[in-house]
Amino acid sequence: MDAATLTYDTLGFGEFEDFPETSEPVWILGKEFNALTEKDDILSDVTSRLWFTYRKNFPPIGGTGPTSDTGWGCMLRCGQMILGEALVCRHLGRDWRWVRGQPPRGEYIGILNAFLDKKDSYYSLHQIAQMGVGEGKSIGQWYGPNTVAQVLKKLTVFDSWSRLAVHVAMDNTVVMKEIKQLCMPWLDYGGAACAEPPGWMPTHNGCLEGACALAEEETALWKPLVLLIPLRLGLSDINKAYIETLKQCFQLPQSLGVIGGKPNSAHYFIGYVGEELIYLDPHTTQSAVEPCEDSQVPDDTYHCQHPPCRMHICEIDPSVAVGFFCRTEDDFDDWCMRIRKLSHTRGSLPMFELVDCQPSHFACSVDVLNLTPGKYQTLLSTFYLTCGGKGHSLDLSGKRHSLDLWGGVREGIFS
């Protein structure tokens, strides 16, 4: 894996000849660009994303563990990148741009501090690796997208500054009621509302005392949502019926991108052009960063200052997690409306279902996201035999199939 990776010191920063000369639109996290006339804008947008890579010479994980994550931490770094994008949207806004050498905002430094490679940073590699033990992953073991999503959900609980609501949608299903209960926990969904929200409102850390009061007001009635949707979009390869839907996710203004990649080699996908996905690659080993005496963070190595990497969409592993950020309830309602429109796109399949409430008859205990292709096919065959082969299609070439799961019919759970 390492033999094929770029080395930070050898990258040709500022060069853009690698990006295609095409009239096709370039989509990056909900923003559309013209590759012929807006190359500088594309590079600026890509460079402004937080780029988390392998690091070395950091304090041992757990006191006696690894001091580098080279070779095993790529999916953890991708998890940091998708969450880092959520924090940028939360505290700085999607249109914020990083400019090399420009004095940084306090919120930006606060975000970087949350990801430094040390045990007391909210989202450090140390925290993710140790929290992953509870998900059955030993330190140094490779993670899948679903495991990273579950770990990030647990870690955000301790971040009182960002006060995010993280929802991991399982079973290919997004339940709107569950999300609204999570983001507005003081509401009584039996009909009444509490007199006032519980006392979870934050105390800002020292470097962020001047945080905008308006931002607090905006989130007083809605905890900003990070929605992560782990998906399996095929067996060993992505089902081509999902390709257009996956691409259209990058067009949504709420897009946080996609974490996935190839087997045992994770990437953070931030957009697409034509049939190619645009991504940030964590497979570069850099030295761990220590804050300066004035609490500033040397940040050059947290931004990828070269043309973004690209991969044909058919090369992506079918196991992914798609991310979205909804700062307000209106953002979430808008996202729901857009997803419903996407579900009617001709010639493609929706990657997940959007429902008002969880069907009471459905309870799936099988972790399909972590099945190998062989076990996946065996499971499908088992359901086919159990159902007697009547009315339950197992066509994996792109057609939806319905399976009677524990008494309830679900469409596309194993698509």
What do these predicted regions represent?
Residues 1-68, 85-87, 91-388, 402-415:
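Cysteine-dependent deubiquitinase/ubiquitin-like isopeptidase catalytic cores across multiple families
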Residues 388-389, 397:
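Short polybasic linear motifs
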Residues 392-394, 401:
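Intrinsically disordered, low-complexity repeat/linker tracts enriched for polar/charged residues
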Residues 81-83:
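Primarily extracytoplasmic ectodomains and periplasmic/lumenal surface modules that are beta-strand-rich
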